[in-house]
Design a protein with these regions (language model features):
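Non-catalytic alpha-helical scaffolds and adjoining flexible linkers that form interface surfaces
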Residues: 1-192
Length: 192
């Protein structure tokens, strides 16, 4: 009998696999980025389908197979696609898509998970300019955590504060051009 692992996960992407199954790209708190197969997740009556939607934060139960992880359960914690307005949803999708492309291999990196979950939690409470700055900070911090940027990350991984001129978002708004240049350089260095 295989051991079951439970962890929190962000669903970065999902790809159809067969008639009713999916392979989900999950950024997990305990195992890093993994690909997991969910049998029957595309059925309308599937219990796990809500917890396996792109832009969902879920508590998942996983089984380690010979070649791939398998989903044994998924309980939806937050469906960010429903919580965010259209503009914020596009920002979140861009950041999670980039994370899916940049993060390689299975290794625990709680900082990456914290960066992205904090970013998602901050979006509904921010103005459009602050959301733009939060998107830049999330990408910059992700690049820093992956080792392709060594500059200032404008605070802690979960700091998307606003309100004062010294806040992370205010500083990012002020330094927008420099941040975009650093992000573009980091993406180039990553080899994408």
């Amino acid at each position: 009998m295989r051991h079951k692992y439970s962890t929190r996960a962000l669903v970065l992407a999902r790809i159809p696999a067969g008639e009713e199954s999916i392979t989900a790209s999950l950024l997990t708190e305990d195992f890093g980025l993994i690909r997991a197969r969910s049998q029957g997740a595309r059925k309308g009556s599937a219990k796990m389908s809500a917890g396996m939607q792109t832009l969902s934060e879920s508590d998942v139960t996983l089984l380690r197979g010979k070649d791939i992880w398998r989903m044994a359960g998924a309980v939806l914690e937050t469906n960010w696609a429903r919580e965010l307005d259209a503009a914020a949803r596009k920002r979140a999708a861009r950041v999670l898509e980039l994370a899916d492309r940049l993060i390689r291999g299975e290794h625990a990196d709680p900082e990456l998970f914290l960066i992205l979950t904090s970013f998602l939690r901050a979006l509904p409470e921010r103005t459009e300019d602050e959301q733009d700055a939060a998107e830049m900070l999330a990408v910059l911090r992700m690049l820093h955590a992956l080792g392709v940027d060594a500059g200032d990350t404008y605070g802690e991984p979960d700091d998307y504060s606003s309100g004062s001129e010294k806040s992370a978002l205010a500083r990012a708004i002020e330094d927008r051009s420099a941040l975009i240049a650093r992000i573009n350089h980091g993406i180039t260095e990553s080899g994408l």
